[in-house]
Every structure is written in C-alpha cells, then in structure tokens.
Amino acid sequence: RGIRVILDLAMNHSSSSHPWFQQAAEYLKSLPEGAEPDSSECPYVDYYHFSREYQGGYAQLDGTAWYYEARFWDGMPDLNLENEAVRREFEQIADFWLDMGVDGFRLDAVKEYVTGSTEDNVEILSWFADYVHGKDPENYLVCECWTDQNTYAKYYESGVDSMFDFAFADKSGIIANVMNGKASATSYAKNLETEQGMYAQYNPDYINAPFYTNHDMGRSAGYYAGENSEAQTKMGNALNLLMNGNVFLYYGEELGMKGSGKDENKRAPMYWSKDGNAEGMCKGPADMDDFRMKFDSLEEQQEDPDSIYNYVKQVIRVRNQNPVIARGTTAYLEQYSGEQCFALTRSYEGSNLLLLGNTSAEAVSVDLTGLTVGGTTAEELVLLGELYTGEETAERAGTVVTLPAYSILILGEE
C-alpha cells in the first residue's frame, strides 16, 4: 500500500542496564577515593553526565559517591549527546535501520538532550538531521518537544521535518477546549493561521505534525462527559485530522478508547474485541487498572455505521480525497466565524477549499455573502465532504449555510 514506516528513536537516554552504562558504572566503582575518571581508560564514562555533587535531575550511582543525570527515572540515565563518540554511535544506529528500509524516525524527548538549553538542543538536532537527510533527503524526522508553542517552534531551525504540535493536543489543548466550550470555535481556525508564520520563520519547508493524544496523555474520550460526549469525541478527532501537515492518530482514538491517570492506563491494549480471549487481545501492562471501556470494541463498531470508528474512517477518506487539506495554507475567515462556528480556507497550488465547522450542540447558520474562494462565489462552491455526528444534515439557501450540531462541511471549486 505504499505505507512508510518510521521508528521511535530515544537518543536522550539509555537503560541503566545497557553495557555502556554498566561499564561506566563499574569503572567509577573501581576508582580510588578522590581519583578523577579518565576517558582513555573507560570511554563510556563520557557517554553520560556524572558528578560528585547532587544536582536536580540526578540520581546516585549505587555503591559510590557519584551521581548521574537521569531526568525521567534512575533506570534511564541521560546520554551526553555533545560527545562526538556518542554521536558516532547514533549514526551507526541510524545506518542500521535506514539500510534495513525504515523511512525515518520519531525523536523522543528532544528538549531534554541538554535540559534547559534550546540552543544546544537545536545544534544536536541539526547534526542528526544533516546526517539522516544526507543519506536520503526523503528520510523523515518528527520530534517530540513537550513545551510551549513559541519554544518548540524554534526547533524547526534545526532542519528537522516536523515538530509535534502540542498546542492543539491533550485535555487542555486548543481542540479539547473548543469542543468543551472553554474556547471559541474561532480560536481553532485563528491558531491554524497564526502558527504557520511562527514555524515558517525558522524553516520555510516545515511540515506540521498535528496530533490529539499520545501515550503520555489521557485518552480523548475522557475529555468529554454528558449526552453529547460521543459527538464531541468524534468531532475532536475530525479537528485533528483536518489540520494541515502529517497528522498522527494514537491507536484506539478511532474507537474512543478510555485510559487516564497512570501511564499504564493510557497504554491499554487495542480494544479489538469485547471477548478478552479473542485473537489479538492481550492483558496490557501489569500495573494497568481494571476498567471498562466507554465505547464498543472494534469488531462491534465496524458493524455500526454511526460508530466513532466509521466516522473517523470517513474523515480520513475526505482528507485523502482532497490533498489540499494536508498540503495547503490556512486562512482564517474572521467575518464568517464566531463563538460556535469557524470558517477557514485551505489553498495549495491553485486549488482552494472552504471548511465550515459548528462546534456546539445547537444548529448554527452562517451567511457567506461576499465570500469568494479562489474566484468562486459562495453560492457556486460545490460539496466536497460533509461530516455529521448525528442525523441532521446541512442546508444551503443562497449564501446562507445552516450547520447542525457538531458538524463540518467542506466546499470547493468545481
């Protein structure tokens, strides 16, 4: 099917059981009291950050007076990516997988390469991006930098292809806030427009990487409660999938899987079947809580035309049928947007379309008088896609479009 495969690559840290760390630890334990480590005797001692003094984010090396940097957990010591020898190791690792046919990497925890220094982290990413793209410009790099939007925008200067767009993700992100009524519908469209300049100033060739949830976040189905929760879950997925760039979808979001609290719950196994003994089913992480899913399993949702699964399939189909959605530039249409409805255009190489969305529980009418999309008036625009979470459908009367609750309309030139 032409599916490209990328692998998760954690360059920030290794396991404390890794031979590099084990050899460094044994060497430090063997040093006479007061002696300084010598990398000519053990090169691996410079693969990590060791210190005689405790610092925040450091753990004590058992049986010694030494401490080592371990930002996430004492079982995951941080690597010294400013060490050329460590860089050569990761070039060999990249070679191994790229030569095997992998198409790129998701780079984990890039803001912790040198904690607190965006400048140093950008330099490290520049080295790796140059190396990977030097092997093949089509090799793809997307980075996880869980911080504010202004900061992760700066990482585009490194030449990596994509940064995960955290501003729209998680229960406090733009999408969930809009769908919960904590933010206006216009904030979705307006932020899509403004972030383009924010990223392009660092890399004009950037490719956005929208996502809604990941393995460290609560499942999106848990963001909503009440009688409209299924509709909100559906449309939240649509707002993610209709962003431009390379969109990422965490497994199980297309089912409305449940999972929050500790990490094990967020990583519950795919809900293939309600029969726990069915093929493909597994028990999940040992420390995962015992909880029931909010919505049906995949095998049940496949048979239900109104399920979250079939809704998400429809959104993806609309996206794939209209490449301008992924590739185009967004323009926010303030005149035609409001608290409960957004209007935006997406344009790419002479192709243009209009996205209208109602993020509320009530029908909303929008008068598009005066609007032209690529030279086509509102009345002449043709239907390219319609996404409904209920039985009601949109109505068009001249320049007036009435959108039912939690719905999206995609219109374009004939």
Describe every region a protein language model picked out.
Residues R1-R88, D99, R106, V110-S158:
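Acidic/aromatic-lined carbohydrate-recognition and catalytic surfaces
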Residues S16-S17, Q22-E53, A129-N277:
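Conserved alpha/beta catalytic core and glycan-binding cleft of carbohydrate-active enzymes
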Residues Y67-E82, N214-A221, D289-E299:
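Short glycine/proline-rich turn/loop motifs
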Residues E84-L98, T233, N237:
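Short, acidic/polar
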Residues G101-D103, F211, T402:
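Short loop/turn motifs at secondary-structure junctions
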Residues K135, Y140, F211-N214, A225-S365, ...:
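Loop/helix patches that line or flank the sugar-binding groove of alpha-linked glycan CAZymes
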Residues A363-Y388:
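Beta-strand-rich binding/interaction modules
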Residues T393-E414:
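C-terminal beta-strand-rich structural cap/linker in extracellular carbohydrate-active enzymes
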